[in-house]
Regions:
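Surface-exposed loop/interface segments of Gram-negative outer-membrane beta-barrel transport/assembly proteins
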Residues: 1, 43-44, 53-150, 168-183
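Outer-membrane beta-barrel transmembrane strands
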Residues: 11-29, 36-37, 135-182
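Periplasmic N-terminal accessory/gating domains of Gram-negative outer-membrane beta-barrel systems
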Residues: 3-13
Length: 183
């Protein structure tokens, strides 16, 4: 029996992007507030990307002064898998390398023995260190995640001394943290 391991392994990917915004203003000021959520499913099972973002911008004029403020915050999560060489116990391959090297005569969906232990396609025929990892087993055991939070903000004030001369002061921050995990 020949199995379509490659065709069965991949899934349809998709992306959804939802945005909401509100803005307003008058002759002396304006504002903009937005929120968004992006969700993407990868073509490899268990993979994807999500991002939530909030943003606020405002400007206010008062006499000779103009104030500006901008703030943005985002949270992003990337769920991925090992696609090529690199992790311990992976025999130097990743899910994509293993997928295209998997024998068509073996059903790749069978990656666990009845007792829950890892199924080895070459059990007893080659050393464990030279074994080929099953891509489905790798998806269950090498779950890589990156979680990133980012904050940006800026503030400025501008003083119009004359119609051709002005002074301004600007300050800002851009800060992020990323946590990586491998389960």
């Amino acid at each position: 029996t020949a199995y379509d391991n490659g065709g069965d392994f991949f899934q349809n990917g998709g992306a959804w992007d939802t945005n909401v915004s509100v803005s307003g203003g008058n002759k002396t000021g304006n504002f903009f507030l937005s929120g968004s959520f992006y969700d993407q499913d990868g073509i490899i099972p268990t993979t994807g990307y999500t991002k939530t973002t909030f943003r606020f911008n405002a400007e206010q004029r008062w006499k000779m002064l103009t104030f500006n403020a901008n703030v943005a915050y985002s949270q992003a999560r990337t769920s991925k898998t090992l696609t090529s060489a690199g992790l311990h116990d992976s025999s130097g391959t990743g899910s994509m390398v293993a997928l295209y090297g998997w024998a068509r005569s073996d059903d790749m969906k069978h990656y666990l023995n009845e007792d829950g232990s890892k199924y080895r396609i070459f059990e007893g025929r080659q050393e464990l260190s030279a074994d080929v990892e099953n891509p489905y087993w790798m998806l269950d055991n090498y779950r890589l995640k990156d979680d990133t939070e980012r904050f940006t903000g800026s503030f400025s004030v501008k003083a119009d001394i004359t119609d051709w001369w002005w002074i301004s002061y600007r300050m800002g921050v851009d800060s992020y943290t990323t946590e990586n995990s491998n389960r």
